[in-house]
Amino acid sequence: MLRDGNEGMFTIPGFSQIQFEGFFRFIDQGLTEELHKFPKIEDTDQEIEFQLFVDTYRLVEPLIKERDAVYESLTYSSELYVPAGLIWKTGRDMQEQTIFIGNIPLMNSLGTSIVNGIYRIVINQILQSPGIYYRSELDHNGISVYTGSIISDWGGRSELEIDRKARIWARVSRKQKISILVPSSAMGSNLREILDNVCYPEIFLSFPNEKEKKKIGSRENAILEFYQQFACVGGDPVFSESLCKELQKKFFQQRCELGRIGRRNMNWRLNLDIPQNNLFLLPRDVLAAADHLIGMKFGMGTLDDMNHLKNKRIRSVADLLQDQFGLALVRLENVVRGTICGAIRHKLIPTPHNLVTSTPLTTTYESFFGLHPLSQVLDRTNPLTQIVHGRKSSYLGPGGLTGRTASFRIRDIHPSHYGRICPIDTSEGINVGLIGSLAIHARIGYLGSIESPFYEISQRSKEVQTVYLSPNRDEYYMVAAGNSLALNQGIQEEQVVPARYRQEFLTIAWEQIHLRSIFPFQYFSIGASLIPFIEHNDANRALMSSNMQRQAVPLSRSEKCIVGTGLERQAALDSGVSAIAEQDGKIIYTDTDKIVLSGNGDTAISIPLVIYQRSNKNTCMHQKPQVPRGKCLKKGQILADGAATVGGELALGKNVLVSYMPWEGYNFEDAVLISERLVYGDIYTSFHIRKYEIQTHVTSQGPERITNEIPHLEAHLLRNLDINGIVMLGSWIETGDILVGKLTPQTAKESSYAPEDRLLRAILGIQVSTAKETCLKLPIGGRGRVIDVRWIQKGGGSSYNPEMIRVYISQKREIKVGDKVAGRHGNKGIISKILPRQDMPYLQDGTPVDMVFNPLGVPSRMNVGQIFECSLGLAGDLLDRHYRIAPFDERYEQEASRKLVFPELYEASKQTANPWVFEPEYPGKSRIFDGRTGDPFEQPVIIGKSYILKLIHQVDDKIHGRSSGHYALVTQQPLRGRAKQGGQRVGEMEVWALEGFGVAHISQEMLTYKSDHIRARQEVLGTTIIGGTIPNPEDAPESFRLLVRELRSLALELNHFLVSEKNFQIHRKEA
């Protein structure tokens, strides 16, 4: 619950509520709508009829639990059963059976779906709303050309445009346009009806000549003319039913189906009263649109802003799942139709069970969740990431935009985003502005609009009412901005307040206000709402902070922030990582595995806890019990904290003592200097779990097998395997050790043996193994402890069932040089040096500083909020207080943030008897000492407690070295990237740098032996072993030879010539 400055109480909606409401709408309405569209299917002789009785369909409770679905790599889904009937018209008999249609993946309590053991989430898509939109563009002569775009429910466009002679054209393609009278006549209107239904009949009569009047004389002629122009067909086509069907399929179905949203928008924009159930474009719509276009030409009416949210709609999870369900039913219809015809042809008696298969529905949803761009793997780096992912909104995807074609105006912030889409939280890079995040109070309306709540101000009654407004409604209201919340009712009537009206920001009297914001967080997303003092930060830095909080790694010992915003508890609660008591009761047993709670009766409920579970970002998800045995609980209390939560609050980082000062250049360019206390005290230690898997296959020589008897391998590498050939739980694994022993059979032909094998067989008669080892080995950087092994046997119809073995290894990672850390204000940096604590700068009470940041990173980046947080955090640490501060506290008075921080520092200095905490000469700063010499620094320095996060970008995942590896086939140069064991490339600029220092031999090595000279790099190994001199290469490297070949493909021969020193005679020598 949040209370604003004056009165009224408002509950923050659940952060996953949008996902829940969308899925519930699909189950409650979408399934029924699509099932009612399923037609009655008859055979060719119309003797048998198949139909579904959709009013009594049922979904069965899943047979497995969520945890089991994840563990066994299954889909958490429900079976759909629908009654079906098969009617014989000749005998009037009917056979009714309840048939299994397929599996529908369900949504769990996190708002996600589990498909093949993987958490997946469907994000919301923003599309152009169907309807008509008017805009004006300048042609090459600088004259305004007015156009009206009719957008269908499927995204198809039809353009109407009016030229300088006031002639109206319908554009059927980029190059073809025809008179507006032709499509109107093709849709069934004659010329008299057209003239009777328009406001400007004289304009419609002005431009058709006798030839054009003949084209629209009848509907058939109009359809032929329309088809000829649309399909670019020459000659004289003949009117036929097939031609009409083709035109219907290619044009009218794609460009003229408006849908419910399009019909509502069309009626509202053109002031029509066509019934809402009429979902297709009518001649009356086209004529009204042309009338409106003529009015635009003569200065009447307003143009449309295509980027306004009232002209956008949201495709939520309900719409996407319903579309896929409809697609699956169409496929099922084709299957049933083909099966009926086949049964009649072979004189078989069909039954509903035989006609229907579950394959279309199951495969459609598996394909959707696995391949659709809007179905993404849930990012589970930390609890915040999980809930933010489900609230994303994207302009990308099918029917949407692409990152390369989207204009700057689409990406930019729009006034209609206020309270609906966060103006800060978006992705960086090519998709900036195209992937946003919904504001925390926003909700999705029934017809796909984003609604935001406001308090309605009534002059008659003093009661406060909450109303949700869609983007097309709040333009008619004067909405007071958030800084008017703290005014008293008596003073408000005399105040002049800033307000928003028709996308403009005004300053008006309070009595003219209709609505006001409910809370300052209203227009921010969850990530931006967790930044304290966000009003003091530049928006670009706040954007970085919103993104970097989602990259924070859960630490082994979490700690909640001293300075927060108050939303930490709600974020942790809605993320689902904490265990919550679902009823009143008493704790009767607790351990690391489960908590047993006794309810009101004698029943005991066992609540399993998550123990060292791997997320898809390799972070560790773990729950720790927080309740002792014998404690009585109320419903909703915390039973166990999850990863990155403490006491039910979000805890992504640590409160550490920081100072802003240069230190020997080690914090140059955002580098960070840290104390060794952060390493040895396990302050920033985190656990990471990696998954390694191997699968057995059936080869042409026989099946592969798992065993611990691997020939030709050292016993040291096999020391951790059990009798089955699988690594034992609890083993400590080093790089190169065998995790799973596997042998693959190979051919026993004599020619396939190596020479030494043939020699052994000939001399000693030893039988050489006919299997090669294809074991699962631990790669570089994977050392750790085995915490879980899963042996999954996949069932199948064959005698051999493939097996999959997964090994989970836990790593303990301390913070080290190269790791990335960041604050909550966009202040990020890389660890450059770890100093002994005695060498770190220390305070006047002897406390060494934990981190040293560069002070130059503050003024130019304008993220001053970190200074307020730093100073207030120091006061909170000394006073043992936690602060929760809403943004924009300047709405109370000027310099409110400074007036909050300084009194707290003053009180801390008094209570702790440390006058250096608050010195009036330089408040917020203190004189500190150099740990190496003990001398004070020349200038006072800002010191304090900041909340610093350790990010997922860690040096252990990025550092890479190569001694030998693969080469590219064409250029024969080392591959690129850590994943391919690639090498460094000495490019053009690197060669310039080497040439600048005159290092000729190093340049030659880099360009020949260590790169793409095939013969030379083979000779290097032998000469190195015997200690000889590496010979100079005699021919050109492979990249030069490639250049020569490419020139030859262009018919250019490249030769080189030698000029003798004596007589300068030219001797030709072939290259």
Swiss-Prot record:
Which SUPFAM superfamilies does UniProt cross-reference here?
beta and beta-prime subunits of DNA dependent RNA-polymerase (SSF64484)
Q: Which organism is it from?
A: Drimys granadensis
Question: What enzyme class is recorded for this protein?
Answer: transferase
Where it sits in the cell: the answer is: Plastid, Chloroplast
Q: Which domain of life is it from?
A: Eukaryota
Q: How does it assemble?
A: In plastids the minimal PEP RNA polymerase catalytic core is composed of four subunits: alpha, beta, beta', and beta''. When a (nuclear-encoded) sigma factor is associated with the core the holoenzyme is formed, which can initiate transcription.
Q: Its Enzyme Commission number?
A: 2.7.7.6
Provide one Gene Ontology cellular component.
mitochondrion
Q: Which family does it belong to?
A: Belongs to the RNA polymerase beta chain family.
Q: What is this protein called?
A: DNA-directed RNA polymerase subunit beta
GO terms under biological process? DNA-templated transcription
Q: Which gene encodes it?
A: rpoB
Instruction: List the lineage, top down.
Output: Eukaryota, Viridiplantae, Streptophyta, Embryophyta, Tracheophyta
**Which one of the record's GO molecular function terms can you name?**
DNA binding
Q: Which NCBIfam families match?
A: PRK00405.1 (NF001616)
Keywords associated with the record: Chloroplast, DNA-directed RNA polymerase, Nucleotidyltransferase, Plastid, Transcription, Transferase
Catalytic activity line of the entry:
RNA(n) + a ribonucleoside 5'-triphosphate = RNA(n+1) + diphosphate
Q: What is its main location?
A: plastid
- Is the keyword Nucleotidyltransferase assigned to this protein? yes
Q: What does this protein do?
A: DNA-dependent RNA polymerase catalyzes the transcription of DNA into RNA using the four ribonucleoside triphosphates as substrates.
